[in-house]
């Protein structure tokens, strides 16, 4: 039977950890999670790095060296985060090799202040790719309107991409189109398509948080009964779209040339509502060929009491469509919800990035 996390892996879900810190790397904890908890990848974001630098003294030595060298705050942030990502990539390298490059992946985000700037996002992606210099790196690029052509351009250059901040089915389809366009351009340039990997990070819990807030405000019996179900419906229909696109003639031509599919990745899987089961966005989103990146608390919850019952996505498409229709019918505009979430998502990461810059600036000054 195996542990819940083993069962999840057996069902075709890659378990990734949504966290990184110098302390976790130095203590050997990441290696332990790989060995004991079926973890086969790591994601990071500005919020995670800001938290890591706020805790303990694991970064003091590097900060001291950077202060002596007189590097700028932005360059220091880039070097500190790249150091952790490179270390994590090396810890995960055996997984990368054992899975022929599918897993063993570590994701590093471009400066979120560039989310509405295509050209600078591509330049930043290129710079981070060169700086980290590991084949199992993925560069995180947001799925903003301006991010879409940046995704295509990065993939065309052979850079593996984790597309982040996807909330809507419409935008997810645009992301898959950007992915296919990038591979087509890479193929025209003579690149080996089998070395270019991508995941599409579809955010889950934030959808319920925003929709449920609006349903509670409407407060009718019908509206209240719809709470806690929209994120799953949205994600399940995203998987239906994935199945459709990756069975198309356009994709088949790329696959025959060695391309790997862009896997759906369930992100924001920590449950925010205490009335919902703390494993909800893992156990109810089991489908082959997906990734679920979990914060430590969610990983621990699934390991402790997660019940894996096989595929919980396919076979639920009609119910998912009916649910989203019902949400609209009681007065919640999903298009407004996802627009709000994208703006909030970018703003949240920008704020965390600025906190990270401030913290590093203070610590560099302390070591000067």
Swiss-Prot record:
Biochemical pathway: Carbohydrate degradation; pentose phosphate pathway; D-glyceraldehyde 3-phosphate and beta-D-fructose 6-phosphate from D-ribose 5-phosphate and D-xylulose 5-phosphate (non-oxidative stage): step 2/3
One GO BP annotation of this record: pentose-phosphate shunt
Primary location recorded for the protein, binned into one broad class: cytoplasm
Active site location: 140 (schiff-base intermediate with substrate)
This protein's record includes keyword Cytoplasm: yes
Regions that span the bilayer: none
Location of the protein in the cell: Cytoplasm
GO cellular component, one term: cytoplasm
Entry superkingdom: Bacteria
EC number: 2.2.1.2
Catalytic activity: D-sedoheptulose 7-phosphate + D-glyceraldehyde 3-phosphate = D-erythrose 4-phosphate + beta-D-fructose 6-phosphate
Family listed: Belongs to the transaldolase family. Type 2 subfamily.
Protein name as it appears in the record: Transaldolase
Gene name linked to the record: tal
């Amino acid at each position: 039977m195996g542990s819940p996390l083993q069962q999840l892996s057996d069902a075709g879900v890659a378990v990734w950890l949504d966290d990184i810190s110098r302390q976790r790397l130095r203590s050997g904890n990441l290696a332990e999670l790989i060995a004991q908890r079926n973890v086969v990848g790591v994601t990071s974001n500005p919020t995670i790095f800001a938290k890591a630098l706020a805790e303990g003294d694991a970064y003091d030595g590097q900060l001291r060296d950077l202060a002596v060298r007189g590097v700028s705050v932005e360059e220091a942030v880039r070097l500190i985060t790249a150091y952790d990502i490179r270390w994590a990539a090396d810890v995960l390298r055996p997984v990368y090799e054992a899975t022929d490059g599918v897993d063993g992946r570590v994701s590093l985000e471009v400066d979120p202040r560039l989310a509405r700037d295509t050209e600078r996002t591509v330049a930043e992606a290129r710079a981070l790719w060169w700086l980290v210099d590991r084949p199992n790196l993925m560069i995180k690029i947001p799925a903003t309107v301006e991010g879409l052509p940046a995704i295509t351009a990065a993939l065309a250059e052979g850079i593996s991409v984790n597309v982040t901040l996807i909330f809507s089915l419409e935008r997810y389809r645009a992301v898959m189109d950007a992915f296919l366009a990038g591979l087509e351009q890479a193929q025209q340039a003579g690149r080996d398509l089998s070395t270019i990997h991508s995941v599409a990070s579809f955010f889950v819990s934030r959808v319920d948080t925003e929709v449920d807030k609006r349903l509670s405000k409407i407060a009718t019996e019908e509206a209240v009964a719809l709470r806690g179900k929209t994120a799953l419906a949205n994600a399940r229909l995203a998987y239906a779209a994935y199945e459709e696109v990756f069975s198309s003639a356009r994709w088949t031509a790329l696959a025959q040339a060695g391309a790997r599919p862009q896997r759906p990745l369930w992100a924001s899987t920590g449950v925010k509502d205490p009335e919902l089961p703390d494993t909800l966005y893992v156990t109810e989103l089991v489908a082959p060929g997906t990734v679920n990146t979990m914060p430590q608390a969610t990983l621990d919850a699934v390991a402790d009491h997660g019940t894996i019952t096989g595929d919980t996505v396919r076979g639920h498409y009609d119910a998912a469509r009916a649910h989203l229709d019902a949400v609209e019918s009681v007065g919640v505009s999903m298009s407004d919800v996802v627009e709000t979430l994208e703006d909030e998502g970018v703003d949240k990461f920008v704020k965390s990035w600025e906190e990270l810059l401030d913290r590093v600036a203070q610590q560099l000054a302390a070591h000067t």
